[in-house]
């Protein structure tokens, strides 16, 4: 337990009161271990969530208005709003968060505005909330420059406002941008939103696509799979493949895309993606009636040149080694997924992994610095 300035103890063990936080060690979960406090690298965690009260209220108000009944991401946001200790951790960008980082051995967090983000509030309100979020994040980074970096929020429904806000975020010194996947069933591969991709490339900002619950996903909800067990990876998979097959990377070849949770399983399918692309090029109908597509490169090329993945929530040595092998060790970044998934034993598991020291330093520190232009 860590003592805060007011004398209270707010260690991770026992901090959560909500039932969803009580987990049993089963299956592949890492065994108990000890974190190396003298590791020859900094631990930079690159998918670490936060939020702020005005956004939580705006999400709940929009949910309760009934204006977007088919959007399970709003249901998810409303559910999280009723978890006080989760909200305490999400909304703290100071003493409590840093105490938890110290307890876990994390040197720096990359802050991402948590799902469902600013794109699921009342239309017209998202850009102002994004601006407020980015000011809060920039202030936290200024107050704790050795501990926090942050990605910018934007509301893709307001394309012109998003472009302006991304330009402002770059001037604020933010280190990229985060999009919590779809907004009422729309995705950034649709060409109406390409000015946002152009702005990201022009301002040298990597885009992190973070999961949210799928749109109109009753079949996920009834089975209890709209989150990490199904809906999250499926939605980011759809979003990422849409960006690739739209030709966006051919149009914006310097665009950088980051996806979490070990690439949402996509690295395992690179062979099949290339094989199916070879059958779909210039042939209408093979992709569910879509028009013919001719990309400049195989799908795997974009994973090797435009896409990076993080290990958020997957502290599993075989998967990490596989992804480092098929994508390249420079394309895999460490992440924890605080506060949703946090584990001292997972951090210790990274220390134990049988990975060459230079490659482990790339995983834990160097790759994050390069992709997100973090300070040395």
Where are these regions (language model features)?
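Mid-to-C-terminal alpha-helical segments outside catalytic/metal-binding sites
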Residues: 2-44, 51-108, 135-143, 164-168, ...
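A short acidic, helix-capping loop that chelates divalent metal ions and anchors anionic groups
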Residues: 117-122
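Short coil-to-beta-strand
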Residues: 103-111, 209, 215-216
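Short glycine-enriched loops at secondary-structure junctions
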Residues: 156, 211-215, 338-340
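Generic detector of well-ordered alpha-helical packing
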Residues: 48-49, 211, 262, 338
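Charged helix-capping and loop-helix junction motifs
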Residues: 126-134, 189-195
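Catalytic pocket-lining loop regions of alpha/beta-barrel enzymes
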Residues: 168-327, 331
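Short loop/turn segments at strand-loop or loop-helix junctions that form parts
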Residues: 112-116
